[in-house]
């Protein structure tokens, strides 16, 4: 149905029932889908005025404002006041009405984390975790928020499981796989909405290109629309077969996939934006696994297994995963060794001092927890020539970070904020850093391997969840395991040691530069062979029935 027709129909209904909150929320999102973002915000702003006692209305307004804020960060839309600041106000109204609802606590904590408003974020997170541990009932938290906020793998799994139960259809039972003729190539499909200029494509393009056609017949199932960009064209060339599924409903898309007679379907999205896990519900392939998109369990019975390595999911942690865990013998994260290495610009051109120590963290703002930022600021206080380089773009977060620095007597110009940049420019500027800094509970993934590719060592802290252990897997795969610390105290000591020994940092940089094309992390062809063996094992494996 035409989007404008839907808006008109809902508007007419809402005019008759102005206090019907659910109807007005539907109208707001219909306006957004029709391209009228301002109209959507106005609709929800009017709704909270009409029904100020509805936590759902305030939550919907806050959520829409967060969506606008995050769209702004991509560089597609800039300027104006910060939607995040207004979202925080709306979240507080929702919390006043529903202080113990996980569906309110989790996004409110996440929004305050984006703003680096740590006291409030920590208080909300403590309440959320306490409720999750105390209650035996449903504890639905969106998977990204669970991965970002909950540093407890058991609680994380429960939150994602309960979220899935309320949002995804129950899958069909697994059908027996057809017997594959000996010597024929494994038929493998990749399902993604990221077949364009996206971190997943930057990482995995080389894998698709390095598949041995004698071993793997590769199929791409694109649920994103063609942007006409160079990455899309490159990926089209890489795959043996290409299927455009954008615009199809789940059942039709699944039928198209099933018609190709796959042995294994690899979902590359998981619980991330643009995911279409509902396509897997009808089991278009006899074996369905998840790889790369989401760092943790999908807790969905349509997914048989996930791809990991011995570091991100160590032996004994399988109980925290609803799927079977398939481990690669190397870092699970594929990297494209053909990605660019542009020459580094001058430090001055990216807002940095030409001399001195540059400590960088290009993680998104919600990952920057207080314990780590305070350690970094303490390092700046001890080393007068050091600066902290961050990619935080949220206006409230920048203000809070500057305030934290000022409280320690650190001049504001020693906190340097990097704006959004496209991949070639981003990789070029990364080389201006001396040391990349990781965080917990959700650490560096693509940002970490980008730094290592550009010759910048990564200081990390091994966490307790998949999302918090990727940094350790990355540094291990480039021969820098000593950069993976086991506690905050070790992290602090290592940071001080490195800041005090610029020669050691220079040696590490030379190590990364000399061995870049020899490290397992950047051996794309070798990774492809290991991944093909994993796919063959998955195709031949009898997975236990999902609970």
Protein language model regions, located:
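Short hydrophobic beta-strand element within catalytic cores of glycosyltransferases
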Residues: 457-466
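Short hydrophobic "strand-cap" motifs at the C-terminus of beta-strands
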Residues: 191, 362-363, 391, 418
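Short hydrophobic signal-anchor/transmembrane segments that target glycosyltransferases
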Residues: 207-214, 370-384
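Short alpha-helix at the nucleotide-sugar/activated-sugar donor binding site of glycosyltransferases
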Residues: 451-453, 476
């Amino acid at each position: 149905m035409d989007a404008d027709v839907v808006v008109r129909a809902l508007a007419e209904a809402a005019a008759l029932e102005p206090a019907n909150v659910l109807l007005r929320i539907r109208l707001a999102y219909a306006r957004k889908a029709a391209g009228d973002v301002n109209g959507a915000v106005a609709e929800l702003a009017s709704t909270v005025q009409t029904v100020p006692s509805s936590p759902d209305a305030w939550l919907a307004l806050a959520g829409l404002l967060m969506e606008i804020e995050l769209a702004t960060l991509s560089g597609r839309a800039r300027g104006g006041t910060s939607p995040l600041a207004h979202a925080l106000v709306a979240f507080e109204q929702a919390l006043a009405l529903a202080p113990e609802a996980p569906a309110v606590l989790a996004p409110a904590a996440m929004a305050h984390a984006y703003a680096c408003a740590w006291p409030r974020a920590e208080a909300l997170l403590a309440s959320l975790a306490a409720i999750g541990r105390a209650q035996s009932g449903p504890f639905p938290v969106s998977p990204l928020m669970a991965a970002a906020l909950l540093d407890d793998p058991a609680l994380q799994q429960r939150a994602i499981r309960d979220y899935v139960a309320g949002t995804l259809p129950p899958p069909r039972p697994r059908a027996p796989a057809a017997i594959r003729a000996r010597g024929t190539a494994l038929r493998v499909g990749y399902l993604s909405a990221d077949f364009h200029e996206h971190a997943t494509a930057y990482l995995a393009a080389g894998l698709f290109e390095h598949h041995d056609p004698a071993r793997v017949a590769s199929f791409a199932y694109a649920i994103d629309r063609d942007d006409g960009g160079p990455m899309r064209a490159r990926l089209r060339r890489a795959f043996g077969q290409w299927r455009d599924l954008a615009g199809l409903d789940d059942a039709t898309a699944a039928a198209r996939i099933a018609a190709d007679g796959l042995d294994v379907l690899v979902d590359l999205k998981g619980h991330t934006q643009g995911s279409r896990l509902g396509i897997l519900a009808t089991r278009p392939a006899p074996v369905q696994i998840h790889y790369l998109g989401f760092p943790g369990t999908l807790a969905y019975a349509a997914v048989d297994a996930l791809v990991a390595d011995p570091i991100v999911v160590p032996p004994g942690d399988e109980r925290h995963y609803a799927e079977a865990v398939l481990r690669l013998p190397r870092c699970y994260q594929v990297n494209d060794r053909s990605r660019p290495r542009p020459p580094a610009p001058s430090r001055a051109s990216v807002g940095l001092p030409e001399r001195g120590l540059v400590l960088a963290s290009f993680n998104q703002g919600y990952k920057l927890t207080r314990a780590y930022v305070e350690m970094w600021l303490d390092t700046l206080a001890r080393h007068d020539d050091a600066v902290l380089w961050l990619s935080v773009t949220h206006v409230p977060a920048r203000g809070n970070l500057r305030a934290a620095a000022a409280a320690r007597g650190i001049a504001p110009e020693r906190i340097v904020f990097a704006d959004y940049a496209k991949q070639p420019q981003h990789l070029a500027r990364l080389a201006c850093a001396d040391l990349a800094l990781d965080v917990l509970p959700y650490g560096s993934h693509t940002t970490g391997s980008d730094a290592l590719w550009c010759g910048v060592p990564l200081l990390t802290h091994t966490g307790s969840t998949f999302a918090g252990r990727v940094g350790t897997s990355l540094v291990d795969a480039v021969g820098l395991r000593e950069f993976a610390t086991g506690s905050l105290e070790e992290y602090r000591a290592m940071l001080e040691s490195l800041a005090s020994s610029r020669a050691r940092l220079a040696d590490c940089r030379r190590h990364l530069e000399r061995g870049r094309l020899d490290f397992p992390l950047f051996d794309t062809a070798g990774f492809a062979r290991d991944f093909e063996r994993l796919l063959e094992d998955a195709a031949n494996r009898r997975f236990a029935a999902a609970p």
